[in-house]
């Protein structure tokens, strides 16, 4: 039986692989429970239905998404993964590279809260958009 830290690290790796790399939208229902909250910058998504709004909007703008976990640290009830992602911007066809950090918090082995910060300004620069625009304004 894996210990708590190993189970949390395995969950994080599976999250990136199933949800993002394999585009298994149904994995969100399996892995992101109703009580879970994602904090993405100033936005907040509660439960799988709200998370899917974020996911679908992002996937509509990006194809060929590939997330590569670079480093993962597990301590107590939290896991932090530094990652790099590649994707193709659907409207322009430009290849993008984005880096970020995701922090996951667990209770009783279940994901309950997540925070992610990613280089939105770097993505906008790759799209050659003014930094004053948000990603959703530039990509839409």
Q: Which residues are covered by each model-predicted region?
A:
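Generic short beta-strand segments
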Residues: 35, 82-88
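Hydrophobic/aromatic beta-strand elements that line small-molecule binding cavities or substrate pockets
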Residues: 55, 67-73, 85, 99-104, ...
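Short, low-complexity N-terminal intrinsically disordered segments enriched in polar/charged residues
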Residues: 1-30, 34, 130-140
